[in-house]
Amino acid sequence: MPEAFERYSSNPTYEPPWRKVRFIGIAGPSGSGKTSVAQLIVKALNLPHVVILSLDSFYKSLNAEQKKRAFNNDYDFDSPEAIDWDLLFVKLLELKQGRKVDIPIYSFNEHNRLPETNTLFGASIIILEGIFALYDEKIRSLLDVSVFLDTDSDVCLSRRLNRDINYRGRDIVGVLEQYNKFVKPSYENFVRRQLSYTDLIVPRGRDNKLAIDMVINFIRRTLSIQSETHVKNIDSLQQIVPTIPHLPLNLVQLKITPEISAIRTILINKNTHPDDLQFFLSRIGTMLMNLAGDSLAYEKKTITLHNGNQWEGLQMAKELCGVSVLRSGGTLETALCRQFPTVCLGKILVQINKVTQEPTLHYHKLPRGIATMNVVLMASHLTTHADVLMATQILVDFGVPEENIIIVVYVCYSESIKALAYIFPKVTIVTAFLESVAEPVVGRLDIEKVYYGC
């Protein structure tokens, strides 16, 4: 790598929104409407990066004797001792660091944690709700806003009866016994004490629309500030690009042969039939995947020939995964699967806000164990680099080493390559056509529209 480029790329500055996650804690007595308030907030905002984290997920697993007591409604779930505070703190810290986190699933029917987990990643706002959300000092230290729902006890009891009977498989006698034995004493001894730690006390709980609107407006202001900061962060990368004199050495481009030049002419000709455009895009895609295959790591493998002799050949050193940046990356999936039939696939949906120009993560589905694989990240263009930049950051946050990522695109601008390589200097970029922002040719082609016909 040229010395000047190495110097610039040694200090990456990109900070995705989930690296500055904000926590909102909502506490209150059982049945006060914590879950309902959290759901109202999420529904009002209607954003994929505002999520709810229930304290119920962090109940401790019970041993045989404790389970027996629980099934007899004789186990105190309304005590702070029932919560695994250490695990909760570790998970919140990991979320604060922008990492992928596996959240446990607790079954109230089995009184145990299930082997499955829920994956949480990419959230900008996390609402932690539970009767003891503000109880633990370490947890409170991570919260940006704390809310306490102060609801009439009779209302709380009626809601608890409805929830436990209809959703947790309890009977009315057992619920009332547990309420009188554990819930009421817990409120006086533990839950109510959290009032002294709260920023906002909400009388009448979920029925207090004004207070809920205040919380929603706070979140909107926070997200607006995060959005402005994120866009400025991306813009700052563009300002650095002119100071980088060289393209990275890990840029791999198709050799410009007469065939490639002819295909380029066909692609940019406005009179080319759509069927021909699709055919030649597929042809270029196949060439790109051949080139990407040469960039993978291989290891020796000894096999037995049909005549019984031994032969030492090569095999891929790691399992291969293809990840499409939707929807443009889907145009390269067929070529990838044709070249590597056993490849596993993942999807990332990053959309650019038309008003703020901020990339936003809307969806991701990645194979388990992706951190140990070589990953081919596919997109049609690397022209406005924000979506591919965010997708690459997602892979890194899922534990994929930079050197195991190969970005494959039909066309890219030299400015976008420099910006991307400034942040991820070890990522390999494979492309067919290299252009500049000032003189785009193939870069003007709407590849997704041509490929999908819409």
Swiss-Prot record:
It is an enzyme of class 2 (transferase). It is found in: Cytoplasm; Nucleus. Its EC number is 2.7.1.48. GO terms for molecular function: ATP binding; ATP hydrolysis activity; cytidine kinase activity; uracil phosphoribosyltransferase activity; uridine kinase activity. Keywords: ATP-binding, Cytoplasm, Kinase, Nucleotide-binding, Nucleus, Transferase. ATP binds at residues 28-35. Pathway: Pyrimidine metabolism; CTP biosynthesis via salvage pathway; CTP from cytidine: step 1/3; Pyrimidine metabolism; UMP biosynthesis via salvage pathway; UMP from uridine: step 1/1. It catalyses: uridine + ATP = UMP + ADP + H(+); cytidine + ATP = CMP + ADP + H(+). This is Uridine kinase. The gene is urk1.
